């Protein structure tokens, strides 16, 4: 993962040719690449493959300015920049933005192995590493910083898709004591995060309600690959989002 960080830094600066992001699986990568047509338009920094939920996957062109605006908007909506846990595939925008947010703010992410699928039992150790690990300081700003700016309170986040939260919910209600114990440990670990950003699909309300009552801070994001991630957070527009009313048009 470290090998791609220099390329991603250049993407955020807009100083590199467009970086095309494809899955590590060569068969899947070739299948998706087959759908790419033409050359990226000028100003492209990153080409992300859409999920294909509503049709054939395609390459979404994202500029460096769009990526940075999404990063700042997300962190503002969550309460400030922080350190992130990567527990979703990085070839989707939800995972890629975890890496980009981390690079943009200077906090190295913690990567949770998911090659064999999401394992709830691995979540507590990953979150412990997230909470206890050292972080690099953000790059110095062009203007003098106040004490509160130069030593920001570290926050901790994770991006999880609804299926992962559903796994937690289902295992908490399992008839198997060992499964419940594993889920309870994961729940306790998740409760130590400042926020869990859920996106990629709708989160059932009963799961949101249950996990929130159990101590988790869940922020439901809504967006797409084409807009570099979330534009609404818990139904409210992020700072980089403008709502256009078409009622009178």
Model-identified regions with their sequence ranges:
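Conserved beta-loop-beta connector loops within the AMP-binding
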Residues: 240-247
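Carrier-protein-dependent adenylate-forming modules in NRPS/ANL systems
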Residues: 1-38
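Conserved pre-ATP/AMP-binding loop-to-beta segment of ANL
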Residues: 33-49, 80-83
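Conserved small/polar residues in nucleotide/adenosyl-binding loops
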Residues: 50, 247-249
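Conserved AMP-binding A3 loop
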Residues: 45-72, 79
